[in-house]
Amino acid sequence: MSGINLTQKIINQFSAHGEEDYPHECCGFILGSFKGDESFSLEYLPAANTKEENRERRFLIDPMAYQKAEDEADARDLSVISIVHSHPDHPDKPSDFDRDHALPGFSYIIISVQNGKAVSYRSWQLNGDRKFFIEENIKIIKEESINVK
């Protein structure tokens, strides 16, 4: 996949989520569709960070929340195209922990939240052998330009 197309509305939603959950990591899903080697965002679904300890540096999404996101996507003929999480007071680059727990095929959007304010975000894809992340291009598009069929 060479890029992810995001609407400003979705960017605003995941940025606000990162700010609301600060100083803990937030997490969530983006539902959308694929067209060729690009993905198109349609909806942001926030998820609860269920990690019991060290939530400032780690997140955990309950398996039932994953299933709910998949079910929601399936019901609308969409896909889970991205998993989003924040890095409180750290850069928007994947950590070794992120790499060790990621799966190929998803975009991973990381939001850098500094002192309670979302300051940047980047999207990453895990390479096929799971050794490193490749940064994806992000294109901001208008909602009305998305054709999911």
What function would you assign to each model-found segment?
Residues M1-V80, D89-K149:
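Conserved beta-strand-loop surface patch within small alpha/beta domains used
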Residues S86:
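Residue-level "edge-of-site" marker
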